[in-house]
From Swiss-Prot:
Probable very long-chain fatty acid (VLCFA) elongase that controls VLCFA composition and functions to inhibit abscisic acid (ABA)-mediated stress responses, including regulation of stomatal aperture, maintenance of primary root growth and inhibition of germination. VLCFA pathway and products may function as signaling components acting upstream of sphingosine-1-phosphate, ceramide and the heterotrimeric G-protein complex, in lipid-mediated regulation of abiotic stress signaling. GO terms for cellular component: membrane. This is Fatty acid elongase 3-like. It comes from Arabidopsis thaliana (Mouse-ear cress). GO terms for molecular function: fatty acid elongase activity. Keywords: Fatty acid biosynthesis, Fatty acid metabolism, Lipid biosynthesis, Lipid metabolism, Membrane, Stress response, Transferase, Transmembrane, Transmembrane helix. The gene is HOS3.
Length: 289
C-alpha cells in the first residue's frame, strides 16, 4: 500500500475538519436527545412485537417470509461499517494521544492505556474519538433490523434480543452524553468482533463454506464479553487509585446493564452446550441428511 494512499485514508478517517471539529450537542447532532432515544427504542420494540403477533396470527404454516438476499446485504453493510469505525476510532485515538498527551500532566494519567480506560475529569464530548462514537451509536439502530429479519424468517421473537439491542443503543448514547470513560476500548472490541461476525454471516448467507466450528458466532461474542469484563475492571481500578474517571456514574449504570446482558448470554451459552441440546442438534442433522 503506497504512502499516499495511507495518508489519504488517515486524513479522511481522523484528520478531516468535520471529524476534528465534531461536537456532540442537541442542536448539531441528529438523534442526540433523550426523547429521540426512548422513542426509537419504544418504536423498535413495538414494531418487532406487532410484526411477530401479526405473522403468528396470519401465517399458520412454518414457511418464512421470502427476503431474498436482503439479510446478507445488511450483513455486508454492517461488516463494512464496523471495519470502518474500527479503523477510524483507532486512528483517531492515536491522533488524540499525540495531540493531547502534554495535557495529561494536569491529571494522574501517565500512559495511553490509562487514557483509553479513564478519561480525565472534565472531558467534553467533542473531537475525533467522539465523532466515531457517534457513528457507532447510529449503527446500533441499523443493527436492530436483524430482529425484524429473524421475525420474518422464523416468526420467533426473543425477548433477550430486544433487551440486548435496546441496551446497546442506550449505553452508546450514555457514552456520548456523559463523555464516559472506557468507550474507546469498548468500540474497538465491538466493531472488530462485529466486522468478523457480520462478514461471516454474509459469507455463509450465500451458501459458501462456513467455519469448522459450529459455534463460531457465539464464540466471537464470548470473546467480546471477556474483553468488556477486563475493561470494566480496569476502569474501576483507575477510578479508585488515579483520582477519578469522567462519566463514572454513567459507567456504573452501563456496568449494571452489561451484567444483565452477561447473565443472559451465559444462560444461552450453557443451554446451547448442554448434552440435551447437542442431542437435539444431532437428531436434526440426521433427519436433514
Amino acid at each position: 500500500m503506497s504512502t499516499a494512499l495511507i495518508n489519504s485514508i488517515t486524513y479522511f478517517l481522523s484528520e478531516h475538519p468535520y471529524i476534528v471539529g465534531f461536537r456532540w450537542s442537541n442542536s448539531q447532532s441528529w438523534g442526540s436527545t433523550w426523547s429521540f432515544l426512548f422513542t426509537s427504542i419504544s418504536l423498535y420494540i413495538a414494531v418487532s412485537s406487532s410484526l411477530h403477533i401479526l405473522l403468528s396470527a396470519v401465517r399458520r404454516s412454518n414457511r418464512s417470509v421470502p427476503l431474498g438476499h436482503i439479510p446478507e446485504i445488511h450483513s455486508l453493510l454492517m461488516s463494512i461499517l464496523s471495519a470502518t469505525i474500527f479503523a477510524g476510532i483507532l486512528l483517531s485515538a492515536a491522533a488524540e494521544i499525540r495531540d493531547t498527551r502534554w495535557l495529561w500532566r494536569r491529571s494522574k494519567t501517565a500512559t495511553p492505556l490509562q487514557w483509553l480506560l479513564c478519561f480525565p475529569l472534565g472531558t467534553r464530548p467533542s473531537g475525533r474519538v467522539f465523532f466515531w462514537s457517534y457513528v457507532f451509536y447510529l449503527t446500533r439502530f441499523l443493527h436492530m433490523f436483524r430482529t425484524i429479519f429473524a421475525v420474518l424468517r422464523s416468526r420467533r421473537l426473543a425477548v433477550s434480543q430486544l433487551f440486548c439491542n435496546s441496551v446497546m443503543a442506550f449505553t452508546s448514547f450514555l457514552w456520548l452524553e456523559f463523555s464516559q470513560s472506557y468507550q474507546i476500548l469498548a468500540i474497538l472490541s465491538t466493531t472488530l468482533v462485529y466486522s468478523v461476525v457480520y462478514g461471516y454471516r454474509f459469507w455463509t448467507g450465500f451458501g459458501l463454506p462456513g467455519s469448522a466450528f459450529p459455534s463460531f458466532v457465539v464464540n466471537c461474542q464470548l470473546v467480546l464479553v471477556g474483553c468488556n469484563l477486563v475493561s470494566h475492571a480496569g476502569v474501576l481500578t483507575m477510578h479508585l487509585f488515579k483520582g477519578g474517571c469522567n462519566g463514572i456514574g454513567a459507567w456504573g449504570l452501563n456496568s449494571v446493564l452489561n451484567g444483565a446482558i452477561l447473565l443472559l448470554f451465559l444462560n444461552f451459552y450453557v443451554r446451547m452446550h448442554s448434552p440435551m441440546r447437542r442431542h437435539i442438534n444431532k437428531m436434526n442433522s440426521q433427519r436433514n441428511a
